[in-house]
């Protein structure tokens, strides 16, 4: 289901999009603040207003990650896979942030020394990619390629131009918006985008729950699917069965500010690496 259709369905069920807008944006946390100051060259005293102005423009699309400014909570560097990802990109590997929103995690990589030409970002909404360029004020300098695409569209530029061309796919806070069977399709697509060789890597940051009955109560309103550890492993078992590929899956619980603020009980952030063998 397209996000616009999801929102329309939710509104008809009594959901108020304005409930996602936080009026308590009073500071910009690290590391986003340093990146905006040092990479984007925004004067320190102007950073908060710059972020507020962009957040208000972006809230034309009333998603929680925008209304609550959680796009500022950068997390890629907290993954235990980050040193490997950064090192590989510095050495020439190509990384895609799938469902990248404003491309904020890609700017973390660039700030830490990754060549921007080795980085790709893809999102369903081209407006988000443009807003990212405005947020980080790097339109004249960034060499990364941003592709607006539906990951499940076989004819999209993402699929026709990058299949088999990538080395790492990073997926953060994206899979849960699909039901279980569609998540399998997305996982298989991510594998198709990777070079067909050992070492090709998917790194995920996934909203997970200790009690699936609570976590998936939103199904009455939206077709989200929150994993527990067992269902997450089952997903990748299915992917291996259907593709014939052998994958090494490693999981960990990741300390995460967004999980701590989540309104549902028992929500945590599941980190995972899926490596082709």
UniProtKB/Swiss-Prot annotation:
EC numbers on record? 2.1.3.-
Keyword field: Methyltransferase, S-adenosyl-L-methionine, Transferase
Summarize where S-adenosyl-L-methionine binds, as residue positions.
Answer: 123-124, 150-152
List, in alphabetical order, the GO biological process terms annotated in this UniProt record: methylation; terpenoid biosynthetic process
Question: What pathway is it annotated to?
Answer: Secondary metabolite biosynthesis; terpenoid biosynthesis
Keyword GTP-binding assigned to the entry: answer is no
What GO terms are given for molecular function?
methyltransferase activity
Q: What family name appears in the similarity comment?
A: Belongs to the class I-like SAM-binding methyltransferase superfamily.
Q: What does this protein do?
A: Methyltransferase; part of the gene cluster that mediates the biosynthesis of andrastins, meroterpenoid compounds that exhibit inhibitory activity against ras farnesyltransferase, suggesting that they could be promising leads for antitumor agents. The first step of the pathway is the synthesis of 3,5-dimethylorsellinic acid (DMOA) by the polyketide synthase adrD via condensation of one acetyl-CoA starter unit with 3 malonyl-CoA units and 2 methylations. DMAO is then converted to farnesyl-DMAO by the prenyltransferase adrG.
Q: How does it assemble?
A: Homodimer.
What name does this protein carry?
Methyltransferase adrK
- Write down the species: Penicillium rubens (strain ATCC 28089 / DSM 1075 / NRRL 1951 / Wisconsin 54-1255) (Penicillium chrysogenum)
């Amino acid at each position: 289901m397209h996000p616009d259709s999801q929102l329309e369905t939710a509104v008809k069920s009594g959901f108020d999009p304005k409930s996602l807008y936080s009026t308590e944006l009073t500071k910009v946390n690290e590391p986003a603040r340093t990146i905006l100051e040092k990479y984007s060259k925004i004067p320190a005293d102007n950073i908060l207003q710059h972020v507020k102005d962009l957040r208000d423009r972006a809230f034309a699309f009333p998603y929680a990650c925008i209304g609550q400014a959680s796009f500022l909570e950068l997390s890629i560097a907290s993954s235990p896979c980050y040193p490997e990802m950064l090192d590989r990109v510095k050495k020439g590997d190509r990384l895609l942030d799938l469902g990248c929103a404003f491309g904020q995690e890609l700017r973390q990589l660039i700030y830490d020394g990754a060549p921007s030409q080795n980085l790709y970002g893809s999102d369903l909404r081209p407006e988000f990619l443009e807003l990212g360029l405005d947020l980080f004020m790097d339109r004249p300098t960034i060499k990364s390629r941003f592709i607006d695409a539906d990951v499940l569209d076989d004819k999209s530029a993402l699929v026709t131009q990058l299949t088999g061309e990538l080395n790492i796919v990073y997926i953060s806070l994206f899979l849960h918006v699909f039901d279980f069977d569609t998540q399998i399709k997305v996982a298989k697509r991510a594998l198709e985008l990777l070079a067909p060789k050992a070492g090709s890597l998917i790194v995920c940051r996934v909203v997970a729950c200790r009690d699936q009955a609570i976590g998936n109560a939103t199904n009455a309103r939206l077709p989200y699917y929150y994993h527990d550890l067992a269902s997450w492993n089952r997903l990748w078992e299915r992917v291996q069965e259907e593709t014939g590929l052998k994958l090494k899956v490693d999981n960990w619980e990741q300390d995460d500010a967004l999980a701590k603020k989540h309104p549902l009980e028992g929500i945590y952030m599941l980190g995972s690496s899926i490596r082709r063998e």
